Amino acid sequence: MAVFEKVQEIIVEELGKDAEEVKVETTFDELDADSLDVFQVISEIEDEFDIQIETEEGLNTVGDLVAYVEEKTK
């Protein structure tokens, strides 16, 4: 499964959104995600990909998060 699809699946599960709402360019604000929601998503992603996400700075969109995960899992 590609990184985007897995990240999308986690966001859908954690935030209760439809997959159609979670696109690369979608911001977490557009998903009505507060800081706790983002923390939960990041925690799940860290577990799934066995990485440590150092900061949420610059992770404003789903695409930003996907790019970060892809870089960390190279």
Curated annotation (Swiss-Prot):
SS bond list: none
Keyword Cytoplasm tagged: yes
Record-listed O-(pantetheine 4'-phosphoryl)serine modification sites: 35
Single Gene Ontology MF annotation: acyl binding
Alphabetical UniProt keywords: Cytoplasm, Fatty acid biosynthesis, Fatty acid metabolism, Lipid biosynthesis, Lipid metabolism, Phosphopantetheine, Phosphoprotein
Pathway, per record: Lipid metabolism; fatty acid biosynthesis
Post-translational changes noted in the entry: 4'-phosphopantetheine is transferred from CoA to a specific serine of apo-ACP by AcpS. This modification is essential for activity because fatty acids are bound in thioester linkage to the sulfhydryl of the prosthetic group.
InterPro entries in UniProt: ACP, ACP-like_sf, PP-bd_ACP
Cell compartment(s), UniProt: Cytoplasm
UniProt-listed Gene3D superfamilies: ACP-like
UniProt xrefs under HAMAP family: Acyl_carrier
Main function: Carrier of the growing fatty acid chain in fatty acid biosynthesis.
Protein name listed in UniProt: Acyl carrier protein
Lineage: Bacteria, Bacillati, Bacillota, Bacilli, Lactobacillales
Chain's gene name: acpP
